[in-house]
Amino acid sequence: MKTECLNIKGLNVWYKKDKPVIKDTNLLVPNHSVVGLIGRNGAGKTTLLKALSSVFDHRQYAVETVTIEGKAASFHTNFYKSRTYTVFTENNSFLNWDFVHYFNFVCRLYHRKRDDTLLQDLISGFHFEEFLNTDIGSLSTGNKKKVFLITAFYLKPPLLILDEPFDGLDFDATEFLYGLLLQYKEEGSILMSSHIAESIVRVCDTAYSIEDGHLDAIESNLEDWFHDVNRQRG
């Protein structure tokens, strides 16, 4: 039985090659787990997740090994892309499409069979019913985020990559998302970034801290780590 969803070794990412933004990074996402990535704004969280999401040209990164579901891969292979789906904290793609067109397009790409019950549960849970035919570019930040979150949890790929998933969501949507995150471990794994320590503690099994492009596993119990962080803040 495979125990690893994603295993990355020796990842470096740069915008200018002499100034790496992500530095010699190793990352493990076990199967059926939620892994957190916490750091201040500008620490490199989004850059790391963009690399893992096939955004960067191969000339902008170097990596020793990439393994997903026990198979060697690279970020740009169709197999790797088919096993992941990313929700970025800001997404300016498909702005002239509405949810229905975007959703149907992505489902065809992922060869996802129709499940109307699941789709309606997600739309209702995020209170998105009245925005299904609104252009994505016309939506508020929170509702725009819901387009991609609904799609993510409908597709159910082995690995969801979520960049600051709670940003822009109201209280009800936030609580609904917490429930989805905890349930998802039955389906697959999640790697999520946050600058909010409470969200990491609430849903994550393990976590990494990132600072100045360096990734470090948090070895202690996450609740103990959270209390230590609060004590240091005074």
Question: PLM features: residue spans?
Answer:
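A short, flexible loop at the N-terminus of ABC-type nucleotide-binding domains that lies
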Residues: M1-D24, Q60
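Conserved ABC transporter NBD signature motif
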Residues: Y61-Y80
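The feature captures the beta-strand-to-loop junction immediately N-terminal to the Walker
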Residues: I38-R40
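Catalytic Walker B motif of ABC-type/P-loop ATPase nucleotide-binding domains
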Residues: L160-E164
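Helix-to-loop junction immediately C-terminal to a conserved catalytic motif
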Residues: S53
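Q-loop/switch helix immediately C-terminal to the Walker
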Residues: E90, L95-Y110
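Conserved ABC ATPase "signature" region
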Residues: N104, R114-F131
